[in-house]
Amino acid sequence: MPLFQNATFHISAHNLSDLPAPAGIEVVFAGRSNAGKSSALNTLANHNRLAFVSKQPGRTQLINFFSLGNDRFLVDLPGYGYAKVPEAVRKHWQLTLASYLSQRPCIGGLVLVMDCRHPLTPLDRQMLNWYSPSGKPIHALLTKADKLSRQAANQTLQQVRKELEASWGNCSVQLFSSLKKQGVEEAETVIGRWLFAPEDDVPDAVA
């Protein structure tokens, strides 16, 4: 049974003032619009509509918290990089996300979701620059791996791993496909390690 099988919606926030009081551990999912972030969350939770998968990139403009129980949360940040978002909205989210990532004390790790065909865009790099000074771990999901040949996907994986280690450190990276369910167990292992201390009993599904 997936580790996040029982994840449930907790709260949405438009501003930092709307965030719940810091408690427990939050694992944050970030990525460009249409990179497959919501699909990855849904796949990990084995829930088709846990994170809203919009046909229109950039539509979800809220920080969404999903509870795993025991003050453990998955946090879905708004997708970035959608050209049709008004400039005022873009600036609001730049400030909000930069502040959240750099100041939120209970973040346990960042999952950076990138389309494996277009990894490490300038906005992905900006996200890494905002977050990496925290010293907390980063795990990159190279999504839509089924769109590339195995050889091309593995070449991309090695290239991204090399650049992440050289430029930001404390990073891990993997291939992922929501369509083929590729990489689900690997992602669960990494995220579960962030959410639960070694002495904790990690259940098959978090209640």
Swiss-Prot record:
Task: Name the species this protein comes from.
Answer: Methylobacillus flagellatus (strain ATCC 51484 / DSM 6875 / VKM B-1610 / KT)
Q: Which key words are in the record?
A: Cell cycle, Cell division, GTP-binding, Magnesium, Metal-binding, Nucleotide-binding, Septation
PANTHER family reported in the protein's UniProt record: ENGB-TYPE G DOMAIN-CONTAINING PROTEIN (PTHR11649:SF13), MSS1/TRME-RELATED GTP-BINDING PROTEIN (PTHR11649)
Binding-site list for Mg(2+): S38, T60
Q: Would you identify the family this protein belongs to, as annotated?
A: Belongs to the TRAFAC class TrmE-Era-EngA-EngB-Septin-like GTPase superfamily. EngB GTPase family.
Q: Which Pfam families match?
A: MMR_HSR1
Where along this sequence does the record place binding of GTP? 31-38, 58-62, 76-79, 143-146, 176-178
This chain belongs to the protein called Probable GTP-binding protein EngB
- Name the coenzymes or cofactors required: Mg(2+)
What is the documented function of this protein? Necessary for normal cell division and for the maintenance of normal septation.
- The highest taxon in the source lineage is Bacteria
Upper taxonomic lineage:
Bacteria, Pseudomonadati, Pseudomonadota, Betaproteobacteria, Nitrosomonadales
One Gene Ontology biological process: division septum assembly
InterPro entries according to UniProt? G_ENGB_dom, GTP-bd, GTP-bd_ribosome_bio_YsxC, P-loop_NTPase
